């Protein structure tokens, strides 16, 4: 499905408007162009952040306008698109534009959502819930497979560790890989501090380099990275996104690590 290339899913947390979305996509395209023979990248952004900490937090432009903007990104830059779907009713509309439909971590056991998303025929990115062990993902995987769709990605995004904290257990990478589906490591959501800032989540982006390197060394097939021109003023996940400059600086290391690890057989866990 991905021709043994590293998978890189990148973009801002939420669609903040057409101009800024196109700007970020264009800069990512330029950054990633030299790696096109080794990295398959997808632009990601959300049309609706339905699980914000506060009722008053920015959620995005909504389904219709959001998909219009994502379609323009796809047409302008020729890049594959990922967005997350929160209700079964949105799945088919989203699949008309997006190559990958993402089931959010909090919703990864919702049968109707999983089935509706899979029935579109799009690639389904299943994010492992913060409350689940990697072994528990067998159930969500089987719900997707029940539709006849076997185009699945599995994403590790950390596990709840007490209050307002997440930890990343790298044992999850080989465990999820046993499914036979590519495993993605979400290096920016994994450094979140959920609810730590009262009405929004905090984050420890200084650990993104370490965790992303560890995941690739453990055999991850790719990375999920949220990035922005200016994370400090981003309307969602400001504390856990990388700047485009930070993203570009880490890219050579990610490329080298993936190439290195792919060159030898991983010992089975």
Curated annotation (Swiss-Prot):
It catalyses: D-arabinose 5-phosphate + phosphoenolpyruvate + H2O = 3-deoxy-alpha-D-manno-2-octulosonate-8-phosphate + phosphate. It comes from Chlamydia pneumoniae. It is found in: Cytoplasm. Keywords: Cytoplasm, Lipopolysaccharide biosynthesis, Transferase. It comes from the Bacteria. GO terms for biological process: keto-3-deoxy-D-manno-octulosonic acid biosynthetic process. One of its GO terms (cellular component) is cytoplasm. GO terms for molecular function: 3-deoxy-8-phosphooctulonate synthase activity. Pathway: Carbohydrate biosynthesis; 3-deoxy-D-manno-octulosonate biosynthesis; 3-deoxy-D-manno-octulosonate from D-ribulose 5-phosphate: step 2/3; Bacterial outer membrane biogenesis; lipopolysaccharide biosynthesis. Its main location: cytoplasm. Signal peptide: none annotated. Belongs to the KdsA family. Its EC number is 2.5.1.55. This is 2-dehydro-3-deoxyphosphooctonate aldolase. SUPFAM superfamilies: Aldolase. NCBIfam families: KDO8P_synth, PRK05198.1.
